[in-house]
Amino acid sequence: MARINWSVLSGPRVSRRTLLNLAAASGAAAYAGRMAIADAALAPPSIATRRAIRQGEPKTGGTLNYGFGISQIPNLDPAKVNLGVVAGGILPLIFSSLVQFDAQLGLIPDLAEEWTVSEDGLVYTFTLRDGLTFHNGDPLKAEDIIFTYERAIDPDFASPHANKLAAITSAEMPDDLTVVFTLEAPFAPFLAVACSRGPGRALTPVSPRAFEEMGAEQFDLAPVGAGPFSFVAEGADLSSGFQLAAFDGYYNGRPFLDQIDVTIIAEPSSRISALEAGDVDMLDIVPAIGVAQLQENPDLTLVQSPGTSWLGLAMNWARPPWDNPEARMAVAKAINREDLIQTAMFGLPTPSIGAIAPAFAWAYIPPDQTETPQAFNLDEAKALAESAGIVGAQPTIMGTPDDQRPAEVIRNQLTDLGLDVQIEQLQQAAWNERWLAGDYDWILNGSVADADPDDGHWNFFFSEGPWNSYKYVNSEVDALLLETRATGDQEKRADLYHQIQTIIQQDVPHAFLYHTVDTTGFSNDVQGYNAVPEMRFLETVWLDR
């Protein structure tokens, strides 16, 4: 196999085709077919509801009313945000990072106008744009990137994303516009998971002066970044709503909108009603229950993109009998995913057999092309339940309002297994606290707005992963995950992820359920929206009013 030349990851643009060439250089012929599928899957997003998009000169001004589907945003410090919906739907509005994604999940410049990667994959050199500023007027220089890095790795700060920076052995600034990161070993997803706008929360630049003057707790609630919109602290409430103001100093030109009013709407049905009534102009994510209904509304446009997420039912290994693999497998095999998708999600998602989302087609294997021990088989599930002694058990599914429908379907299905499943619905902040503390029997969760399969695997299935609150430990999986981070050969990475998938299917840290389709919706007078899967970039949006 030829030696990998990591320098092809240098910017100012890294396309998916470059990733193909990287693999081809190592003789990965079979990868070409998968990349063709990936190119098709990540073509510019389809307009699910076909409307004539009015052409014309963008208009400046106005306020976009943005309905955001969550009960409460716990915090907005990018290095602390642990909810993918917030990372994808809010952070890209307030923060810029070194690089960003295009619609095909290729990498393009953001704060860094270009970057180079050494042939051995160990040295990343970023050249910042000249004249960058934070929202508070402070200049953004290389020293601020260094501050952001040092803050994220500080054990006292306790960023859940510090692991994405663990490979860095030195961070240097030869001058005000140059940042050099040296890694101890190649880290394949470094640009995507550490340096990108939205998912790359670990290195998303924040204002040092604002952080030091405000303190960590206040900065959580009113952050200062360098993105297209600044956070308006006055009157802000992360449980009800807040305002974002167009940033005149944004490097790519002031956004067309004057303001974005973010309204927190917890209940899915309330979100749908708000969009139809015109109370909001846009929903970050259209609930599955409302997609068909909104598609029929001639005043609305829906845009769909391939999802990068997965959802599963996690069973807490620290709470018997769910430490018993037979008990977990019994539950996994008793869930009819096709029925779950049709009944709870109106047929929109695709069944999941693991944590590799369809958007990552270079590694994704459709369920009908492989076998999984978690496949629905009620007879086998009943035999396992009897053997494990769980008939009559009363586990509780902990969820949020968005989880109610799938939780109810799962509860009903598992009555056939002799389980009396309870449902506990919590608002987001309480759910988040108990999730991270491992204080639950079962939980519906998974990864959202992934920049690379590393996000949805390392965080959940590495023994020390930040989201592994159900205490899953498998040394073989740990070793394979470390290996995925160290290789630049996409075919090799895909094979490693397939090995991991086989193991976690059998271990059942999650009963894997489905992959969602990313659907956003807005009124027809919202123009200029550029869709990137599970991320919201709104600086190009304007209102035709």
Predicted regions and their residues:
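N-terminal secretory signal peptides
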Residues: 1-18, 22-26
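Ligand/substrate-recognition segments at binding pockets and active sites
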Residues: 66, 236-240, 361, 382-449, ...
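Gly/Pro-rich hinge or "lid" segments in bacterial periplasmic/extracellular proteins
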Residues: 102-106, 197-255, 259, 378-379, ...
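Surface-exposed binding/hinge segments that line
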Residues: 127, 163-210
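Extracytoplasmic/peripheral linker and loop segments enriched in polar/acidic and small residues
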Residues: 326, 374, 420-431, 436, ...
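Structural transition elements
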Residues: 350-387, 405
